[in-house]
Amino acid sequence: PRILQVSGIGNAKKLKNLGIEIINESEGVGQNLQDHLMFRPVYKVKNLKSLNSKINSLFGNFLIGLEYIFKQSGPMTMGASQVCGFVKSDPSRATPNLQFHVQPISTDILGASKMHDFDGITPTVANVRPTSRGEINITSADTRDNPKIKMNYLSTQDDRDVAAKGLKIVRKIMLETETFKKYEPEEYRPGAHITDDEELVQAASEYSQTIFHPVGTCKMGKGDEAVVNDKLLAHGLKNLRVVDASIMPN
């Protein structure tokens, strides 16, 4: 959307305010922003070694490197998650709307802080059908200036309700199933003492992160907010196509 906006394609009023000549008015450019927000509850475990201690240790990292060099196996061959699953937040839904990703590590800020000093796992949960919508808008006519991105995560009651249900499903699996009893799981974050839905979502959102799935800001379809047609051609223009994830309506 930024390329279109600086080129004069988008919301006419906003672009004129930035001194940009209007080539084509297209209200939907930069609107309808959607993303998958990942909640990252953390559980302490016993009788099971997570990767925390190995990653926090210089010697452990050395062993990880050697395993990869000589065996092409181990943590350096792993993907972002080792377990994935889908469930419904409510049985009445036609299809699953929650996705789990499980990692044998735990940390406060993924990629920006050390692993915890205990054995822990992170069973993340994300609403894959969010109803919240954000927007992205340029701040100047200079392509070197970053746009303003407003995600509006959890701005609808439905998204907050689904988030609470997802976190409670994770809690039930971790704390109430026979499978995990031998590992004596303890909810480190957000904390089993938090039972109110709104409080649970608020606490968990402090450690939530994007899964980097933004779509929708040049959506395909008909109507005022649609930017491209089913051939990816921009409405109102000739021979201009948008070919990336922004064309996905949802």
Where are these regions (language model features)?
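Glycine-rich loop(s) and the adjacent beta-strand/alpha-helix scaffold that form part
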Residues: 1-67
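FAD-dependent oxidoreductase catalytic-site/capping-region signature
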Residues: 41, 45-50, 59-250
